[in-house]
Swiss-Prot record:
Its main location: membrane. Pfam families: BPD_transp_1. It comes from the Bacteria. This is L-cystine transport system permease protein TcyL. The chain crosses the membrane at residues 23-43, 65-85, 183-203. Keywords: Amino-acid transport, Cell inner membrane, Cell membrane, Membrane, Transmembrane, Transmembrane helix, Transport. Residues 19-207 form the ABC transmembrane type-1 domain. Residues 44-64, 204-222 are cytoplasmic. Belongs to the binding-protein-dependent transport system permease family. HisMQ subfamily. It comes from Escherichia coli (strain K12). The gene is tcyL.
Length: 222
């Protein structure tokens, strides 16, 4: 038992370094995924059916296939076409593309939940559709989308462990490498799992804080 604890202490710098990569991939994947997801959400709401169909096709592909397969096609498959990417950029692209598919549906549902009468009211005072979206619809939709998007981000933190399969030195990969040297399988994977749990707990606490702040603002008299 004492030896296992000492091993975890000795391995902690490597695990924390891996956790740093995990957070980088999570934040980057969520940021770029939200940007692309917003574009896809607008496409899903477009009155032009080919645009809607293209967005639905993209979302169907990335939600209907395993993330690990998407990562493999980017890292191992693209070199067949002369496109070679390092592990971290490959993981960032794969996570962003996958996140975008889920974020798009969340954002689309949030935008659609806003009363249609607000579009008419904004148009009646001379606001353009983009001004209406930016000033009236998006702030309200953001409140609706925050809880599911926060949950998606927490899931993304855990999903980054799949990047270990394409040699990204994130938290799970570091645990694998240490395990291969020490053969302490249970100890190292337990330590890695505890770090994932701590990160998820901190993020969940922040999510609850922001939601409470928003709810408090809504209850305050205008």
């Amino acid at each position: 038992m004492q030896e296992s604890i000492q091993l975890v202490i000795d391995s902690l710098p490597f695990l924390l370094k891996g956790a740093g990569y995990t957070l980088q991939l999570s934040i980057g994947g969520m940021f770029f995924g939200l940007l692309l997801g917003f574009i896809l959400a607008l496409m899903r709401l477009s009155p032009i059916w080919p645009v809607r169909w293209l967005a639905r096709f993209y979302i169907s592909i990335f939600r209907g296939t395993p993330l690990i397969a998407q990562l493999f096609m980017i890292y191992y498959g693209l070199p067949q076409f002369g496109i070679e990417l390092d592990p971290i950029p490959s993981a960032m692209i794969g996570l962003s593309l996958n996140t975008a598919a889920y974020a798009a549906e969340t954002l689309r549902a949030a935008i659609s939940s806003i009363d249609k009468g607000q579009w008419e009211a904004a148009a009646s005072i001379g606001m353009t559709p983009w001004q209406t979206m930016r000033r009236a619809i998006l702030p309200q939709a953001a409140r609706v989308a925050l809880p599911p998007l926060s949950n998606s981000f927490i899931s993304l933190v855990k999903d980054t462990s799949l990047a270990a399969t394409i040699q990204v030195p994130e938290l799970f990969r570091q645990a694998q490498l240490i395990t291969s040297r020490t053969l302490e399988v249970f100890t190292m994977y337990l330590a890695a799992s505890l770090i994932y749990w701590i990160m998820a707990t901190v993020l969940s606490t922040l999510q609850n804080h922001f939601e409470n702040q928003l709810n408090r603002q809504e209850r305050e008299p205008k």
